[in-house]
Amino acid sequence: MSEDQPHANGAYYRRVLLKLSGEGLLGNKEFGLDLEMVDRVAGEVKAAHDRGIQVCLVIGGGNIFRGISTAAKGMDRTSADYMGMLATVMNALAVQNALEKRGVQTRVQSAIPMSMVCEPYIRRRAIRHMEKGRVVIFAAGTGNPFFTTDTAAALRAVEMNCDAILKATQVDGVYSADPNKVPDAVRFESLTFTDVLTRDLRVMDTSAIALARDNNIPIVVFSLHTPGALADVLDRRGRFTEILCDSHQE
């Protein structure tokens, strides 16, 4: 990431990983996909792509199936997590379809091979896709149970040499508490990874935070529900929280 001046495309990033929660694709529904929301997300990704920014995505599956909560109700955790991974593939295919309807060549790569549906995850191929101007969506998490899609996002961001992880959430940054439950919760403009861990702010799970910290990849948290928010983040405008290594925090 360039902290002083933007790249030739006008943005401060060359290659980013966008992390979307499955719940973010619900829209006003209680379950499944809101296709209008999927299309809006695709429009924001296309706008970034059209500026020459290389974009890859990791999408959760909580709108369809949540492995952790299902395991808590009695299902074997491993089986529940694999079902959750399959839900992420469904979401990835939906976003791929929306992007390609807008003329953006998109590839889905799954950590669990399913050759009739999408490509297997191959690091060099994914990088080459982005270099050729394609969007890449990584599905099925890490391919292993007991790892969240947040951890998968951090892992893929490291493997893809991304400049930042852009985490789209239900709120416009990181707060001291859930702003929907605590009206006077404080929103942070910037934090260090140490802040996140010591204050237990639950931005991502600790393994994802550790991966990003150890590889010096900033995390930018912003609202999925604000139109144009992705473009604003790419220009370092608007409302968001940036999480940096301690050495970058003034």
Curated annotation (Swiss-Prot):
Record keywords: ATP-binding, Cytoplasm, Kinase, Nucleotide-binding, Pyrimidine biosynthesis, Transferase
CDD domains: AAK_UMPK-PyrH-Ec
Predominant subcellular localization, coarse grouping: cytoplasm
Enzyme Commission code(s) on record: 2.7.4.22
Compartments reported by the entry: Cytoplasm
GO molecular function: ATP binding; UMP kinase activity
Entry's Gene Ontology cellular component terms: cytosol
Activity regulation details: Inhibited by UTP.
Nucleotide-binding as UniProt keyword: yes
SUPFAM superfamilies on file: Carbamate kinase-like (SSF53633)
Positions of UMP binding: G61, D81, T142, G143, N144, P145, F146, F147, T148, T149
Reactions mediated catalytically: UMP + ATP = UDP + ADP
Family designation: Belongs to the UMP kinase family.
HAMAP family: PyrH_B
Subunit and interaction comment: Homohexamer.
The protein's name in its UniProt record: Uridylate kinase
Organism: Rhodospirillum rubrum (strain ATCC 11170 / ATH 1.1.1 / DSM 467 / LMG 4362 / NCIMB 8255 / S1)
Protein's gene: pyrH
